[in-house]
Amino acid sequence: ASGTVATASNLHVYFHDGTSILKYVNATTTTPITIANLTTGTQITDVPAAATTVTVCGNIPAGTSLPTGGTVAALKAVQLEITSQSAVADVVLSGDDKPLQTWTTGSPALPYAPGITDGDKYAEVEIGPAVARVEIEGLATTASSAVDGFTLEGIYVNNFFEKFNLAGTVVGTKVQYGATPAAYAQGQGLYTPANAGKLFDQSAVAATGIPKEVIPPTAGQRWAYQVVPNGNSTDANEQLQLVFKLSNLAAKAGSSVNFGTGDQFITVRGFK
């Protein structure tokens, strides 16, 4: 739904020296150090003096193996499927690596760390979604449009990457279906039934009202897709795209427009 805030179901805290993981803390709602503790501020003991940096990630999908030791590079190389990010509650959370700073009495004021003492180390880490979310409220004609009616057959994500890693970069080859009309249908490529609502939606909804409009079948919901950046290319054929497949396009009387027969496509790109 619109306006939904991502929340954490698990958090993973790594203390390291930039190369090696020196201490790992897992936080859920039931662990000794809970998510609520980390949210409001808490003391973590036995952090090695050699630790200089803290890294936090969260909402790691079930079945994904995270290291509890080893190298930071191995942690950042952990790969995730974009289809695992289909719901707000599933969105992976991450933040920038933050340095551990030494606290001197009274400077700065740390209301979230009442037990901190002179010489202790602290870090403030902000985390947010590791992927971008594209929401579609609906598709409608304008008053000046020559369109008098249409059916939205489906919405398809194109020019996307299947995987990303905890370093925030894409992995593998970009998935591109190009200008082949038959590619945009359930059962083609990665547009499988299991990926419905993740990489595409296909519902054949007829436009109604004046102006003609199509909205998601469930009130208060939006068509939404999680994506990862696919580069800063200015080439329209390389940018992330949403492809809208329309049928039954009808022109207003007297418009002199002929849409022809068969499906028609609208491609939206230029996402920032």
Residue ranges of predicted features:
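Extracellular beta-sheet/turn segments enriched in Thr/Pro/Gly and aliphatic residues
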Residues: K76-P129, E137-L139, V268-K272
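Tryptophan-paired
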Residues: G3-V72, L110, R133, E137, ...
